[in-house]
Amino acid sequence: MVFAGGERDVASAKTIRILTIPPVMAAIEILVLRFVKGYFPGAAAIWTIFFLSILPTVSYLVWWVVPALRRRGRKTQRPLAVAFSVLGYVLSVGYCFVRPLGSVERIACCTYLFSGLVIALCAAFRIKCSGHACGMSGPIALLSLFVSPWFLLGYLLLIPVFWSSLRLGRHTPSELVLGTVTPVAGILCMMMLFPV
């Protein structure tokens, strides 16, 4: 029975990680900013969701359909996800300035790029920073600043996210904390660059 409970724990942890993947949180963030506050007007919301949500998700499809990548497991899955994510973040920042969009939109997109570069830099030095925690924390912090402080309650969602990551052995507590604070630092930096 203990083994069965363990299997249920693993299944629950995997489900939590799937439901809270960063691209889903990014899409929710953009939609809330669009429909509650009117940011990302017109087609900007669609394009930004494509850059921040759809493009990063494509990495998992590429990993799945290319046997050589799939055979190597998470050794290739994580770097591929980071690469596709950073590409999407670069495109979103470029779009913000070409369009051009306002300060809040620039803060949002530049924070994603900042966070992606920090995660990539950490990986280059063999330091793991939880992209999952980062992808949860960033939207919560941004929405609490620019929509309503009630969104700070969203940080309670990090409890099951932390549990699932620890249960599956994906991250250590320090890696999860590093991932959580990275986008907050990014938002603060971007707010100095793009005053609201």
Segments predicted by a language model, with ranges:
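The first (N-terminal) embedded transmembrane alpha-helix
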Residues: 16-36
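Short, amphipathic, aromatic/basic-enriched membrane-interface segments that mark the entry/exit
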Residues: 12-20, 73-81, 100-107, 121-129, ...
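Alpha-helical transmembrane segments of multi-pass membrane proteins, especially transporters
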Residues: 13-14, 18, 44-52, 77-82, ...
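Short, Lys/Arg-rich, polar N-terminal cytosolic tail immediately upstream
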Residues: 1-14
